[in-house]
Amino acid sequence: LSLRRQRQMCIRDSYDIYPDKAIERELYVSNTVGADQNNKMKKIGIFLEDMDHVTVDGNNSLFMFHGKMTTFATIGCEDVEFKNFAVDFQVPTVIDMTVESVEGNTATMYIPECYNYEVAGTTIKWYSDVSPYTGQRYWSISDLSGYHTQREDTVQGIKFGAGNGNAALKGVASIEDLGNHRVKITYNSKAGEVQNGMCFQSRPTVRDHAGTFFWKSKDIKMTSLDIQFLHGFGMVGQHSENITMEDVDFEAPKESGRTTAGYADFVQMSGCKGAININNCTFAGPHDDPINIHGTFNTVTSISSDRRTITVQYNHHETAGFPNFFEGDEIEFMTKGNMITVENSVRTVTKVDGPDGMGGNMGEGSGSLTTIKLTLDKAIPADVQVNQHVVENITYTPAVNISNCEFKEVPTRGILVTTRKPIVIENNTFDGMSMAGIYISDDAQGWYESGPVRDVTIRNNTFTRGNAQAIFIEPTNPTVSTEKTVHSNIKIKGNTFFTYNKRVLDAKSVDNLTFKNNKIYRQDPINGDGSLS
């Protein structure tokens, strides 16, 4: 569904949206498939392009998507609101199966009704639904061994991001289809993870689509949405300004028997500016981080003789192909080794030659999806050297407010955020995080997710049943400067921590760190229900 002229779209009831008739575009999205040409084409269900002042009001409708696709997207839009609807997939691309009973070396597994499957000897084949246009299935998988599998203890509400992988289908002697979406698995040797209430969640590892996508857009708002499943890589905001989420709940429907609502991250804001406001939202059942807000470092690979023109490159294989800089943007250089900013290195971009994000070129781009040439207003400092320094677009760094949200059933971190603009994280609950509840990094070694924080307030949050540090501040600087810090001005006040053997705070390379008026309680790990010993 492509919207170009309408200014308001009000709909009601349930709608099936198929990739067969969807808009298709070549797009390059941060943290997904990088320059991979096998996955450059994106199917988009609801697509707004170059439109302003639009409201998409679902009137409590359900949008049921099929196959693999982006649910809704804006490109070059301003003042757009999506509200009052639910999003789900007919057959989610994450396969959930839950242990109902265990007896000796056998286990009975429940497979939710949305999945199509067939027992084949000692394995199970899985199928999508059938296209009404072609009569063909959108996808099928005959063996989950190549999938990434996580586990969720549905009794305790705790998710495990690592361990014995798909233990449910290891050491299998036989599988019997019992009907009614139950299978009986007999094991030669049953793994300890196969126990009552354990849900095994298996997904592909290729992020071929974004779940939703907002690019070169401004003043985007999502209100009262139920995100029951997103295929691919969550809600991605890329080089957009002012994105607001109010009462957006990410959670599989209780009656569905499923436990997974997201293929990877739920919310990924990459290189945005203005304000990112996330309020009164629920994040339950992702396969990666619920919220990740960051910029992107590019490594300096060449410098002209007058030091006014530089070539930079993308470094991680999942990020490439889109413009990370625009004329008029300010940039700043950092040293890769210690992650310290280079003094007096802020410059203004006057020309960009590189990929345009749609398979073409900006300026006199070479056609490379991984390199960008920048012309600057004046020469860069002599300290900046090839392959030793990275550059960040500091124009596209947002202020962030995350408040009154609930994070649960998470296999990774709750919130990742790195931006130099003010950050406020308040009145949230973090339950059972497998890793840190709040993680502040700044990375020019692996993901190249920038940048330093300068003003952070973490207050009045509650952390329970965490399996790691509640708050973790760790830039990935292999060399720690003895003169300067990467981060500064972090205030942690009025929070409540329930823990049994983990740190509530672990910090590195921070100037002016305040930890004040917080309450720390010893939690009973045996009860596992938040009660105290």
Indicate where each model-derived feature is located:
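Short glycine/acidic-rich loop motifs that flank beta-strands on beta-rich extracellular proteins
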Residues: 65-71, 91-95, 209-211, 231-236, ...
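Short "repeat-start/strand-capping" segments in structured domains, especially the N-termini
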Residues: 52, 77-81, 217-221, 238-244, ...
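Single conserved hydrophobic/aromatic residue that forms the stacking wall/gate
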Residues: 1-7, 11
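Ser/Thr/Gly-rich low-complexity blocks that favor extended beta-strand/coil architectures
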Residues: 65, 89-90, 114-175, 320-367
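Alpha-solenoid helical-repeat scaffolds
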Residues: 157-257, 265-269, 276, 280-282, ...
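Extracellular beta-strand-rich solenoid/capping regions of secreted or surface-exposed proteins
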Residues: 5, 16-55, 64-83, 91-106, ...
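Small/polar beta-strand repeat architecture
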Residues: 155-207, 345, 351-400, 408
